[in-house]
Amino acid sequence: MIEPAASSPRAMIEYIAKAIVDAKSEVYIDEYEDGNETVIELEVAEADLGKIIGRSGRVARALRHILSAAGSKLNKRYALEIIE
């Protein structure tokens, strides 16, 4: 069972990623500061990489858009990197 997303953008991205992929135990999230923005790195199983990126990058773009909206609510900048 997937737990509801918490108020942090990191937890929200993890929640969405686990809902999309098949190998939920292989979803890894890392977060670090890079200058004036917080970078969230998302790593999934190689077989699920296509699901996270989506056709023509639509899913990845949607994840970044959601992250941007959450960041503007918190007055912070966030970036999403998908690790291959």
Language model feature labels by segment:
Residues 53-57:
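Glycine-centered tight-turn and secondary-structure capping sites
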